[in-house]
């Protein structure tokens, strides 16, 4: 909708008379905040990890604090780091006023430990699963997956990163000093009112998109880094928005890992797609000592920002994700980026069957069926491969619990090099072909879910239930 003459005069008067536009119409502040780095919570033998879901206060803009949800007293949650071979006792405590269920996307555990409808945590109650970590290094994330309420619960702040490390990742010559040269970046979009308070009005179709870009809860932050390689663990925790990331001076991003672990070798890219729910690891060469910014597309012009005073906008006010500012001298010895990240090529098995799935909003649900907790949509066998062909009439991300998959083709073409590792989340704009490997078992009482990662669509029923039966014993 274009601005009427009267609306334009009103907006111009606001801008000139007050000396500045309200928060929603302002461009990003010239005074950048420092990147908030979530505290690190590590597993220790015999000691539980506590994640308390509670109300908190957080300043998204300046010093104006807004009421939010979060974990352990802050917006979003701590970064949890565990190790392959650990048995992690996790204690979720719900100190909110409504039921919540939590899950860890990317963690390979049985359906009994995945969360969801069968593991609702009532207000004032706890859930204390013991999680056997038996998988290679991966960047996972924990978040609310409350049935029919996942979108507002994640938007409110119930999310955080969950890192799995193993012997390979510990020996890898990649930056590994958390908060020094190894940073988690949780990217979201929000809509803030003139007081810096998040607004959430889900649309009748599609998913919610905001006009304000946040990283770890901050707008356009900066971080000081040492000269040399810097490692960024990227998570798109937005409800629906996909990002195309690039560096401001044209230098490459080196992609080293996707959702479920390392790529076979680093991949240099000028632009990198990050879909909702997707995780990627990149490293950046800061050895020359030049400041650089990560950006995500084109920002709104002044007319778009003025229009945002009168109607919700889906155009980002600023597309600045993060500015990296190198400090200090270049170390005498710096590691080169390894030529190989995995000792062996990814081994593919034989596909035993094919399935097709239609994701839509015109025809709600998946294959025209709305999620039903009493219905099993897919039954598979642990240790087998299947070919899944996913179609979408509206671009969206798609996630499967309890599996790892390889992207074989996208709209008939081979997958991009940065998408040729193990994944659990994929962007679907047309048709994608996946080869799905079933790692873990589930049951009708504790099924895995597959769903649209456009969270409002998942809440409206674009989800299905997967039961993976144990492999037969010989």
From Swiss-Prot:
GO biological process terms on file: FtsZ-dependent cytokinesis
Entry's Gene Ontology molecular function annotations: copper ion binding; oxidoreductase activity
Subcellular location: Periplasm
Record-linked CDD domains: CuRO_2_CueO_FtsP, CuRO_3_CueO_FtsP
Modification after translation, per record: Predicted to be exported by the Tat system. The position of the signal peptide cleavage has not been experimentally proven.
Highest taxon above the source species: Bacteria
Family matches, as InterPro entries: Cu-oxidase-like_N (IPR011707), Cu-oxidase_C (IPR011706), Cu-oxidase_fam (IPR045087), Cupredoxin (IPR008972), FtsP (IPR026589), TAT_signal (IPR006311)
Pfam families: Cu-oxidase_2, Cu-oxidase_3
Key words of the record: Cell cycle, Cell division, Periplasm, Signal
GO CC annotations, alphabetized: cell division site; outer membrane-bounded periplasmic space
Signal peptide: 1-27
Domain Plastocyanin-like: 229-288
Main location: periplasm
Function: Cell division protein that is required for growth during stress conditions. May be involved in protecting or stabilizing the divisomal assembly under conditions of stress.
Similarity comment text for this entry: Belongs to the FtsP family.
PANTHER family xref list: BILIRUBIN OXIDASE, CUPREDOXIN SUPERFAMILY PROTEIN
UniProt protein name: Cell division protein FtsP
